[in-house]
C-alpha cells in the first residue's frame, strides 16, 4: 500500500489507472485462456438481430438533432396502426368479458348446487342425529332391563327359599316370569 500512496518510484501503468479511477489494485487477476468464440452465451448474443430506432437521429442522449434531417413517421400509417391495435384490444376485451360472463354463470350454478347439496346434507344430518338419539334411548332402556333382570334373577331364588320355609298351606305358587299361555302349553 505504501507504493501506491507515497512511494517515490514510478508506479506501474495499471496502478496509475487505478489511482486515476480511485480504485486500488491489490493483486493483478489471472487472465483465463477462454475462447470467447465458442461460448454458447456469446453465440446466442451474436444471433440476436440489431434493431434501429424508429426515428433515426434521436438516439439516447441526444435532445435535438442539429444538422441531420429527421425521418418522420407517416401520421396516417401511425393512425392506422393505432386503430388496428385499438380494434385488437377491443376484441381481446370482448373475449375476456365473454369468458368472464361464462365463468360467473358457471360459478353461480356451482354455488346453487353446493347450497342445495349442503341443505340436503344438513337435513340428513339432523335426521341421523334424531336416529342416534332414539338408539341412545333404546340402549339406555336395554341397560335398565338388564339391571331389572339381574335383580329378578337374584330375587327369585330368595323368594323360592322363603316360600319353602313357609308351611305348605301358606306357600305360594312357584314364581314364573313367563305368561300364563306359555305355562299351560
Curated annotation (Swiss-Prot):
GO cellular component: BORC complex; cytoplasmic side of lysosomal membrane; membrane; synaptic vesicle membrane
A GO biological process held by the record: positive regulation of anterograde synaptic vesicle transport
Record region (Disordered): 1-20
Annotated coiled-coil segments of the chain: none
InterPro entries, alphabetized: TBORCS5 (IPR018780)
CDD domains: BORCS5-like (cd22789)
Lipid bilayer topology: Lipid-anchor
Pfam families: LOH1CR12
Keywords, ordered alphabetically: Lipoprotein, Lysosome, Membrane
Keyword Lipoprotein appears in the UniProt entry: yes
Signal peptide coordinates: none
Entry's localization field: Lysosome membrane
Functional note: As part of a BORC-like complex may play a role in lysosomes movement and localization at the cell periphery. Associated with the cytosolic face of lysosomes, this complex may couple lysosomes to microtubule plus-end-directed kinesin motor.
Protein family per UniProt: Belongs to the BORCS5 family.
Protein name: BLOC-1-related complex subunit 5
Organism: Gallus gallus (Chicken)
Gene: BORCS5
Amino acid at each position: 500500500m505504501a507504493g501506491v500512496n507515497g512511494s517515490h518510484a514510478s508506479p506501474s501503468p495499471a496502478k496509475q489507472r487505478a489511482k486515476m479511477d480511485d480504485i486500488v489494485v491489490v493483486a493483478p487477476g489471472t487472465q483465463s485462456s477462454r475462447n470467447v468464440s465458442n461460448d454458447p452465451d456469446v453465440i446466442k448474443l451474436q444471433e440476436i438481430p440489431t434493431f434501429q430506432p424508429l426515428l433515426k437521429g434521436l438516439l439516447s442522449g441526444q435532445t435535438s438533432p442539429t444538422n441531420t434531417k429527421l425521418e418522420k413517421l407517416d401520421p396516417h400509417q401511425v393512425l392506422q396502426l393505432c386503430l388496428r391495435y385499438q380494434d385488437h384490444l377491443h376484441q381481446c376485451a370482448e373475449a375476456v368479458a365473454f369468458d368472464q360472463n361464462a365463468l360467473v354463470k358457471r360459478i353461480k350454478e356451482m354455488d346453487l348446487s353446493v347450497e342445495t347439496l349442503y341443505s340436503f346434507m344438513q337435513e340428513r344430518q339432523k335426521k341421523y342425529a334424531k336416529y342416534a338419539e332414539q338408539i341412545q334411548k333404546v340402549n339406555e332402556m336395554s341397560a335398565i332391563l338388564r339391571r331389572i333382570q339381574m335383580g329378578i334373577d337374584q330375587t327369585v331364588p330368595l323368594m323360592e327359599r322363603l316360600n319353602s320355609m313357609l308351611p305348605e298351606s301358606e306357600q305360594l305358587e312357584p314364581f314364573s316370569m313367563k305368561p300364563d299361555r306359555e305355562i299351560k302349553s
